[in-house]
């Protein structure tokens, strides 16, 4: 299993290691000095650290290049500004394998921390995506124009303060067609992901 975890503090590696002992884990942190101290204190055993701002396109490209991308799970518990969350999702969603999951935590902060956010709140964007999933092509032109549903979203499930966006299985991959909003099956099924494949968490 390949996974990525976007964290603001290195306080949970032992938890992830105990929950996913065989996973390949990557954790991203904004504070480089924090990473150095964590490594020196032996807190990141079995964890591959990444450093930088998740809002910065160059940083995101560096993370993908260093980690190799192709994650089964991504958990964004990093920067809570809407611009940070959206920038990371826009670049990293394509790195989620078919059948994988992209978790976004603390979505409520996008409203409380940014009374006048740089862009619409991530919770509003996700609501538009859900609207398009629920009713297909019927009467969703407005929400699709504001925030088109990303390609290959199978479902979105939300709870208090967090949502998970699931990527469809390769065999049933659905693509959002630009412009018209029509959705279609892939002409040729992509290879299935084997259950025993290593899962990587990218945060």
Functional labels for PLM-detected ranges:
Residues 1-203:
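S-adenosylmethionine/decaboxylated-SAM
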């Amino acid at each position: 299993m390949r996974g990525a975890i976007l964290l603001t503090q290195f306080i949970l590696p032992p938890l992830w290691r105990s929950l996913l002992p065989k996973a390949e884990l990557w954790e991203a942190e904004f504070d480089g000095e924090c990473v150095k101290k964590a490594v020196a204190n032996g807190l990141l055993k079995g964890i591959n650290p990444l450093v930088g701002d998740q809002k910065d396109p160059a940083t995101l490209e560096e993370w993908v290049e260093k980690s190799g991308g192709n994650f089964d799970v991504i958990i964004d518990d990093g920067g809570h500004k809407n611009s940070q969350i959206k920038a990371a999702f826009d670049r990293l969603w394509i790195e989620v394998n078919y059948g994988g999951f992209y978790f976004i935590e603390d979505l409520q902060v996008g409203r409380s921390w940014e009374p006048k956010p740089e862009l619409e709140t991530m919770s509003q964007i996700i609501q538009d995506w859900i609207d398009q999933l629920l009713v297909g092509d019927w009467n969703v032109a407005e929400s699709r124009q504001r925030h088109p549903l990303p390609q290959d979203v199978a479902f979105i499930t939300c709870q208090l303060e967090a949502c998970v966006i699931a990527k469809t299985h390769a065999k049933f991959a659905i693509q959002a067609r630009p412009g018209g909003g029509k959705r279609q099956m892939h002409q040729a099924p992509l290879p299935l992901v084997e259950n025993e494949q290593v899962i990587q968490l990218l945060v």
